[in-house]
Regions:
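Acidic/His-rich, metal-assisted hydrolase cores and their charged scaffolds
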Residues: 1-137
Length: 137
């Protein structure tokens, strides 16, 4: 299973991830309330017109792992966001397991490093591969 985390308000990034899902033959799932709100508002206002059908969160677990691309909230390590819950195995509908991959598609905002690293450490403890931009000094 692949999960991509980004800011829910980045409509262009959400659209790009949807195109990646289509191009790779994966079904797109939105995980996190703010992503669902963005999706509805964007559709209602004429954005995301060519967006693929979205897999409901409670159906993700019934699909083969290699057929799903999840777009999840929590790129900055917010404790109540979907990615944080996934990293702690506390999400209501979805789990991440060894061999899964999480892609951080947004840069760290200074001051959030501790929260972000906490989530990344939890993911590593689950055996999840984390892909993020390298930080250099």
């Amino acid at each position: 299973r692949v999960a991509v985390t980004c800011f829910a308000t980045n409509v262009a990034r959400v659209a790009t991830v949807a195109k990646v899902a289509e191009a790779t033959g994966r079904r797109l799932a939105l995980v996190g309330r703010s992503l669902h709100r963005l999706y509805e508002v964007s559709k209602d206002n004429g954005y995301l017109q060519s967006f693929p059908d979205v897999v409901p969160e409670d159906s993700i677990g019934r699909l083969p792992r290699e057929e799903v691309l999840m777009l999840v909230t929590g790129t900055q390590g917010e404790p109540r966001a979907a990615l944080s819950k996934l990293s702690r195995n506390e999400h209501q509908h979805v789990t991440l397991n060894a061999g899964d991959t999480v892609v951080y598609s947004s840069r760290e905002i200074p001051g959030n490093e501790t929260d972000i690293n906490r989530v990344r450490n939890h993911l590593a403890g689950l055996g999840v591969e984390v892909l993020a931009e390298a930080v250099t000094a």
